[in-house]
Amino acid sequence: FSNSLLQKKHLSDTKCNALCALFAENKGVQNGIIIHSDLLLEYLQENYPELYFVSSTTKVLTDFEQFVSEVKRDDFRYVVPDFRFNKQFDKLQTLSKSEKDKVEFLCNECCSFACKDRKRCYEAVSRKNLGESGCGHRCTANDLEEGYRFSKAMKNPGFIGVTDIQEKYLPMGFTNFKIEGRGLGSALILEFLLYYLTKPEYQLHVREELYLDNMLDLF
């Protein structure tokens, strides 16, 4: 749904419409969809008004005023800023309470903070997901072969840790945070959940309940 290259012909996709219909049927907690394309936004608003919508970080809005304009849009319940805005506290503090309530920070981005090809990277992923070839983009990161590493993400200038949330963001009035990595392996996702959602003194207990036992032999 956050594909940046959608065309009108893609709006009739059977699987995506079935998924939206399923989300819309839920009478309990309201479901939402992360969106890049305004074309898709208009289609979903018309056909699935039960859903709420989130402005995707794949828009790569690197101008703060542009980001603020996105936050002010009534179309979105939440807006995920480019992770390079995460620590620009002087600018973030200028937002009103209602605007702060709409900001959803991406906490654990691993991409280079200085990357200038982020938008092209997302477009390449969009082309691949549409089955197109020859995207013309190749990541030039020095540590590309390592893949995603949480330890590396923690060193990123835009990283938001638990202490940051508790001691900086919450006092400023920000309460929405998201974790990257749904497409990564379950072991990494477990580490995210342990770090962000489990008190340190209970993390080992959770690991033991899930997979650690005296028969596990890794080496």
Regions from the language model: what does each represent?
Residues F1-Q66, E70, F76-F219:
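Active-site pocket-lining/capping segments in soluble small-molecule metabolic enzymes
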